């Protein structure tokens, strides 16, 4: 079903972002399987394999994938993974300035977001925690107006109303 959907979307000229299935499977697909589908579907963007809330292993994967050849026109997107704000800041900095990723994503459900913004409703905590994380990185000058940021899903859709003054958020 998914394959047919993506082939139809490609034929219709739709913009395709291919994920690595970390959220659905708990870990990214293996490299050979990912490469097969990347070459079959030729997505516009590909989310390189990351490791949930583990910035060290995510950076190791991102370093490996930065040199992997993908079809022409496919942009590699790296994901910030972390266990707190400091490691998220470092992860974004390294992905952008050392690994050279042109587009970087933020997941929506990291547990530590709720620690940034404690709230009785954990979904509100995660929503506001991601907003605060991105806002603080922008205010600190790490994220620039010209950066390209993708938001991977959301804890609550109300989150998107907080971003109209963030020119770097390119896609959701």
Go through the PLM ranges and name each one:
Residues 32-46, 92-107, 163-172:
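Structural recognition of alpha->loop->beta junctions
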Residues 18-30, 77-89, 111:
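Active-site mouth loops of central-metabolism enzymes
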Residues 6-11, 62-73, 96, 131-145:
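Surface-exposed amphipathic alpha-helices with a cationic face
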Residues 31, 58, 74-75, 133, ...:
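Residue-identity detector for threonine
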Residues 52, 81-152, 156-158:
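Glycine/Thr-rich beta-alpha phosphate-binding loop at enzyme active sites
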Residues 1-71:
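Non-catalytic, usually N-terminal nucleic-acid engagement modules in DNA/RNA processing proteins
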Residues 56-72, 77-94:
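HhH-family (HhH-GPD) DNA N-glycosylase catalytic core used in base-excision repair
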Residues 1, 14-19, 44-48, 76-80, ...:
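Hydrophobic faces of well-ordered beta-strands that scaffold small-molecule active sites
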